Regions:
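Outer-membrane beta-barrel signature, preferentially recognizing the C-terminal barrel domain
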Residues: 389-406, 588, 592-599, 649, ...
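Short acidic/polar hinge/loop motifs at secondary-structure boundaries
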Residues: 54-55, 181-209
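Gram-negative outer-membrane beta-barrel transporters
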Residues: 734-736, 755-854, 896
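C-terminal beta-signal and adjacent terminal beta-strands/loops
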Residues: 794, 850-858, 876-931
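Transmembrane beta-barrel wall of Gram-negative outer-membrane proteins
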Residues: 250-363, 405-407, 656-658
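Extracytoplasmic beta-strand/coil segments of soluble accessory domains associated
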Residues: 142-181
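N-terminal periplasmic accessory domains that precede
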Residues: 85-89, 141-144, 161-164, 176, ...
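Short, acidic, small-residue-rich periplasmic hinge/interaction motif at the N-terminus
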Residues: 22-27, 32-37, 66-70, 80, ...
Length: 931
């Protein structure tokens, strides 16, 4: 194949046409078609609006530029042998509909940019532009992405954090910034926290659902590329200033953003700087429950009984501050050589207090006849805070400090007909939790409870005798301080080469490249327990305390109760040996500490060729070699380290792929793809650690023998684009997955050396057998401009995704194969919809986002499986343009007060229920020097 391709590569040193296509205000237009129709030579502009036409015959040529929603431009240039001609084109908005010229409003221009890119891609992709992101009230990239077909998100404290693409869990997808991978600040997995990045910082979101050979292969669900802003053709300053309120805490939200862009030195240097600040003081009302299937009778024998064995009532108060800065430079050395410098820094602080009431060791009591006559257990109250006495930044709260810094230098060079592109990226992600403190008081075993299980979605416990839970009845149990730190460093490099090809007057290119990805990850935590040397902490009445119960607890009729205040806990001088005796507790952290190093070498060969004026093929193969080494800790008991265990893996994957694109008409496109992808195990899953927890009767092990998950994928998609800006599409997908990874759970594990003959619970990540995932997507978006008068201002945005999956190879605790389990993350139904109205000044939009419930984590049996419950979010936003440069906007999120809910086994058994309430924002957007 290689020699056949090289035989038809055109080496004639004719000429080259290069340039940039911009809109009327100087912003690059991505996805524009640039073509010399008489020669069938053409190209699409990149994300910044740049294009290159190679191997152009000498002489006078007419170059046509087309873009959805914009008038076609035709330019005449003279091409000389071996020379590069620069052609910059500025398009004007307007499209001929019948005999009427429709001029796009500002709100539709962003949609036009996204649809043009999507239309001209060789692979199946969804693209959302910055202007379109701004049409929804989404503060971070995660919330913006849940509007895209086939994507659902898992939330944290009411914000979208982890991405699920086409029913595949976060670790089966990849996330990039400007085409380069970014490291993860998560301690034990590869997930990228999408709520770390404000949506204002992004110019374009690309979701590649069928990857091409020149992309990293570890993207079974999809590869997400976040493209930051590029410099416009002239000076531009835009920004946002807003404030709002969260109804759970009734505290303000502050948001600000600023973008500056310009070109200097006769347009040879471009600069764009973006900054964003968001300060959100919020919280959540939470209950959590663990359900049991058996209990002990009066004789100590097990019998079947479904009940809550442990339950928490939790009150969270969180202040989340996001700061992001991005600076991008481009240097046009000459018409054939450009250097880019791209940087981005994201920093998020979460300050959190949590008040946690726990009912535990719950068990039935029996009368003389052996019938249940009541319930008893133990009650605990715990405060979470931070050691402000040693670090002012923690502010009496637990501080989670997450930062991601990435910088890329890349070059684009043209030597005759040879394109040479290269890049080098260095990136660092870190998460630090300094001086995290917990203090716990308890009311001991045998406390009688009233247990209300009439509604299993809202189980509740109360003390039979209220005097038993008075403040003075809670005695000191535990006081701890811990420090957590996770760091990941990435060093990535690539070289890509491409040459034009011609077959029977149909153009194409052959492309080859080499890729290196190096990664270093480590987690270094510690944990200390402190005992007071005096009696001044003996019971809760002796210390500063406060009742944090509230009348309108959103999770149900619960009272969280009285706790030690975080201010008191924060100022305890735990390191003073005259006041406290400290002891390190290795069992709480040592097994979780590890080091991992990963090196991935990749190469590819790819041919992208027009076979006719309607049919194009992209075919190629990618080869990736993975080498991983890691060090983990084997812990014998709660205090002793046996040894450090080392391990390594080395494997190679060969991953061919074919993409077909058929342009039935100028606006109707059919795509099909066969691809092969993989997902590497989470780092911590590979670490050969052992964690023995006698108090909990649990044994947890890593698995150095895990194989990577591989998938063969088939996709088909049909798209019809409307000239008046819109799209209707339908497609289907099928994935044959091997060696998927799940957590094996044995609830009756016995090991004479470890458990002493008792039955413990054993956890270990293992490879399953095979899985099949399939589904379908439909999407429709259009401004209803064909309607008369007032009605033409309405617009519709809708998409629906169906997914289903089956698995083979998941075993229960008895070693039996389970046949009733879907892949975690497979939500059967996803729906997005919005109805909007806009005229020259006013825009109003109401939107919904719905995700059906799905398996989130496989347990030891169907009874223990954890499900992520269905969710439906309703948001409304509106804006009014005072001038072309100034717009007022109003946003309302989560108007239905949609909670986060997990359930255990069946929907009636609540496992976690967490409410956040609605939030509102109002502000101004400005765009200065807009032409």
């Amino acid at each position: 194949m290689l020699f056949a391709i090289l035989a038809i590569v055109s080496y004639a040193q004719n000429g080259v046409i290069r340039g940039t296509v911009t809109d009327e205000i100087g912003l690059g237009l991505p996805g524009a078609n640039v073509i010399i129709e008489s020669l069938t030579i053409g190209a699409s502009t990149d994300v910044n609006g740049n294009f290159t036409l190679k191997n152009v015959p000498t002489g006078t040529q007419e170059v046509a530029v087309t873009f959805l929603g914009y008038a076609t431009s035709i330019s005449t240039v003279t091409v000389e042998d071996g020379e590069t001609v620069v052609l910059n084109v500025s398009l004007k908005p307007g499209v001929l509909i019948g005999e009427e010229v429709l001029v796009l409003g500002d709100r539709l221009k962003g949609q036009a940019k996204a649809l043009n890119q999507q239309k001209n891609k060789s692979n199946i992709t969804n693209i959302v532009a910055a202007d379109q992101i701004g049409r929804f009230p989404d503060a971070n990239v995660g919330d913006a992405m849940k509007r895209i077909p086939g994507i659902t998100m898992q939330g944290d404290q009411g914000e979208a954090r982890n991405i699920i693409v086409r029913g595949l869990a976060p670790q089966l997808n990849s996330v990039m910034i400007n085409g380069e991978r970014i490291p993860s600040a998560e301690g034990d997995n590869r997930n990228i926290q999408m709520d770390l990045i404000p949506s204002d910082m992004i110019q374009t979101i690309e979701v590649n659902k069928a990857v091409t050979p020149d992309m990293d292969a570890d993207a079974i669900g999809g590869a997400v590329n976040l493209v930051t802003r590029a410099a416009s053709s002239g000076m531009r300053i835009s920004g946002t200033a807003a404030s709002g309120m969260n109804l759970l805490t009734n505290k303000p939200i502050w948001t600000g953003s600023l973008v500056y862009g310009n070109r200097f030195a006769d347009d040879k240097i471009g600069l764009v700087v973006s900054a964003n600040y968001n300060n959100h003081d919020f919280g959540s009302d939470n209950v959590e429950a663990e359900w049991e299937a058996t209990a002990e009778d009066a004789n100590g024998d097990d019998f079947d009984l479904v009940y809550v064995g442990e339950m928490d009532i939790r009150q969270y108060y969180v202040q989340r501050v996001r700061r992001s800065v991005s600076a991008n430079l481009d240097f046009k050395l000459d018409e054939n050589n450009t250097i880019y410098v791209q940087t981005m820094y994201n920093w998020r602080d979460d300050w959190e207090n949590r008040y946690r009431t726990t009912y535990r060791k719950i068990a039935p009591t029996f009368d003389a006849n052996g019938d249940i006559n009541g319930w008893e257990g133990e009650m605990r109250r715990q405060t979470k805070a931070g050691g402000t006495i040693y670090n002012d930044r923690v502010k009496d709260r637990r501080l989670e400090d997450q930062r991601v810094l990435n910088g890329t230098v890349r070059g684009e060079h043209l030597f005759g007909n040879l394109d040479l592109n290269w890049s080098f990226t260095a990136a660092k992600a870190s998460e630090e939790r300094p001086f995290e403190r917990y203090i716990r008081y308890e009311q001991g075993d045998g406390l009688p409870f009233n247990y209300d299980i009439n509604n299993t979605e809202f189980p509740s416990f109360t003390a039979v005798n209220p005097a038993d839970v008075a403040v003075g009845m809670f005695t000191f149990d535990e006081l701890t301080e811990e420090n957590q730190y996770t760091e990941e460093m990435d060093y990535n490099g690539r070289i890509d080469l491409s040459l034009p090809t011609v077959i029977a007057d149909n153009t194409g290119e052959v492309k080859a490249g080499f890729r290196y990805r190096g990664k270093q990850k480590n987690r270094a935590n510690n944990f200390f327990e402190y005992a007071p040397l005096g009696s001044n902490l003996d019971d809760m009445s002796l210390v500063a305390n406060e009742d944090y119960s509230k009348d309108n607890y959103l999770a149900g009729d619960y009272n969280v109760g009285t706790f030690v205040t975080p201010e008191y806990l924060a100022q305890l001088d735990l390191h003073n040996e005259t006041l406290f005796e400290g002891q390190e507790v290795p069992s709480e952290y040592l097994a979780g500490n590890y080091e991992a190093n990963e090196a991935i070498l990749g190469g590819y060969l790819m041919w992208n060729q027009d076979l006719t004026d309607k049919l194009a093929i992209l075919a190629g193969v990618r080869v990736e070699n993975t080498a991983i080494s890691y060090v983990g800790n084997v812990v014998e008991n709660e205090e002793d380290l046996i040894r450090q265990e080392k391990g390594e893996q080395n494997y190679t994957n060969v991953l061919p792929g074919i993409h077909l694109k058929y342009d039935a008409t100028d606006d109707f496109i059919i795509r099909a793809a066969w691809t092969n992808t993989l997902a590497r195990p989470n780092y911590f899953n590979l670490v050969p650690f052992q964690d023995i927890r006698p108090d909990d009767e649990e044994l947890i092990k890593g698995n150095a023998n895990l194989n990577p998950t591989t998938s063969m994928n088939f996709d088909i998609m049909a798209e019809n684009y409307f000239k008046s800006i819109g799209l209707v599409s339908a497609g289907a997908f099928y994935k044959n997955i091997n060696d998927f990874i799940y957590t094996f759970v044995d609830e009756n594990y016995v090991d004479a050396d470890i458990t002493g003959g008792n039955e413990w619970t054993f956890f270990q990540p293992q490879n399953g057998g095979s899985a099949v995932l399939y589904g379908a997507e439909v999407a429709f978006q259009r401004q209803l401009d064909f309607l008369p008068g007032f009605w033409k201002g309405f617009g519709v945005y809708f998409n629906y995704t169906y997914t289903n999956s089956t698995t083979e190879g998941i075993r229960n605790g008895d070693g039996e194969l389970r046949t009733d389990v879907a892949l975690p993350g497979t939500a059967p139904h996803l729906v997005n919809g919005s109805l909007s109205y806009e005229n020259e000044k006013l825009v109003v939009r109401a939107s919904i986002n719905y995700a059906h419930d799905y398996v989130d984590e496989v347990g030891g049996s169907a009874f223990s499986d954890r499900y992520y419950d269905r969710q439906m979010f309703v948001d409304v936003n509106a804006s009014y343009a005072f001038t072309e440069n100034l717009r007022l906007f109003v946003e309302a999120n989560n108007l239905t007060n949609q909670p986060l809910r997990y359930y255990q086994g069946v929907r009636e058994r609540t496992m976690q229920l967490e409410y956040y309430n609605a939030r509102f924002n109002v502000g101004l957007k400005f765009d200065m020097f807009k032409k």
